[in-house]
Amino acid sequence: MKIVFLDFEKGIEEFEAKIEQLRFAQDNSALDISAEIARLQTKSLGLTKSVYAKLTPWQISQVARHPQRPYTLDYVQHLFTDFEELHGDRNFADDQAIVGGLARFNGQTVMIIGHQKGRDTKEKIHRNFGMPKPEGYRKALRLMRLAEKFSIPLITFIDTPGAYPGIDAEERGQSEAIGKNLYVMAGLRIPIICVIIGEGGSGGALAIAVGDTSLMLQYSTYSVISPEGCASILWKSADKASDAAEILGITADRLKEMGLIDSIIPEPIGGAHRDYPVVMQSVKQTLQESLRKLQDIPLETLLQKRLDRLLGYGRFKINQPD
């Protein structure tokens, strides 16, 4: 798969293009230029490390939206077995922006729920660009209650620009659906692990992100609004998105400092899309550890900690001088 490079990766793209040219030349001639290829690969890797060591929040948001980044169903394919997708909210429709179902993780039955985006134009439209409508959140709610009924741990994958803001979604109760999920998830009598794998956009993300453990991939984002949306409100121009991204504190390290997430899952150099096996192994290992810890905690203690965590969002202290 040919890598799609972002605007700030132009230097890396040039190195990779030269490497591809040399590989093609070597395959079609008797010349041995492997040493030159290795030299360029070393330079490309060094430049990639240098660029990714000092990413701005705006650049991280671009990586979080990368079109080749692994989505929920990619994690399902690599980390779980015997996945059985469950469809529909039993009320209106089967929203394709939310996927979910039963699966096995290391032999243990779990319930999976996650946002799903599309790769090409047709699939993006089919998945509504990863923006769920009320029926998507109600489908998720149905699966949550099913998991609780059978005492099955819940794992959610968050990757959405936000809930769908269309008139039809509002008419069918978008805010009610999101609010109901928050209320129910706060009291679900099962362990819940939430993994932010790409964009964590506002209430559309939070509607499946109330849990006991919140994990976040290194180059993912989590925010009340997109940088572009914030810039449009504050400065009346999306051109200020980079400034907004800095102010919003959307990155994993900032959110960890504020106590809004528990752990940051490292990504390969260049982002998760550069090496699926590596990021899948990192996510698997972190999920294993998190699930084991949660299952050792008494249920009532787990529920109280979850509620305290949810009610603590937005609280902060100001140190005033004497």
Curated annotation (Swiss-Prot):
- Which SUPFAM superfamilies is this protein grouped with? ClpP/crotonase
User: GO CC annotations?
Assistant: acetyl-CoA carboxylase complex
Q: What is its EC number?
A: 2.1.3.15
Q: Which reaction does it catalyse?
A: N(6)-carboxybiotinyl-L-lysyl-[protein] + acetyl-CoA = N(6)-biotinyl-L-lysyl-[protein] + malonyl-CoA
Localization, per the record, is:
Cytoplasm
Do the record's keywords include Transferase?
Answer: yes
Q: Name one GO molecular function term.
A: ATP binding
Enzyme class of the recorded protein, top EC level: transferase
- Pathway info: Lipid metabolism; malonyl-CoA biosynthesis; malonyl-CoA from acetyl-CoA: step 1/1
BP terms from Gene Ontology: fatty acid biosynthetic process; malonyl-CoA biosynthetic process
InterPro entries recorded: Acetyl_CoA_COase_a_su, ClpP/crotonase-like_dom_sf, COA_CT_C
**Alphabetical keyword list:** ATP-binding, Cytoplasm, Fatty acid biosynthesis, Fatty acid metabolism, Lipid biosynthesis, Lipid metabolism, Nucleotide-binding, Transferase
Domain CoA carboxyltransferase C-terminal: from-to ranges: 30-293
Location, primary (coarse class): cytoplasm
Lipid biosynthesis as a keyword of this entry, yes or no, is: yes
Gene3D superfamilies reported for this sequence: 2-enoyl-CoA Hydratase, Chain A, domain 1
Q: Which PANTHER family match?
A: ACETYL-COENZYME A CARBOXYLASE CARBOXYL TRANSFERASE SUBUNIT ALPHA, ACETYL-COENZYME A CARBOXYLASE CARBOXYL TRANSFERASE SUBUNIT ALPHA, CHLOROPLASTIC
Q: Give the UniProt family note.
A: Belongs to the AccA family.
Listed under subunit, the entry gives:
Acetyl-CoA carboxylase is a heterohexamer composed of biotin carboxyl carrier protein (AccB), biotin carboxylase (AccC) and two subunits each of ACCase subunit alpha (AccA) and ACCase subunit beta (AccD).
Spell out the protein name for this chain: Acetyl-coenzyme A carboxylase carboxyl transferase subunit alpha
Q: List the source organism.
A: Nitrosomonas europaea (strain ATCC 19718 / CIP 103999 / KCTC 2705 / NBRC 14298)
Q: What is the lineage of its organism?
A: Bacteria, Pseudomonadati, Pseudomonadota, Betaproteobacteria, Nitrosomonadales
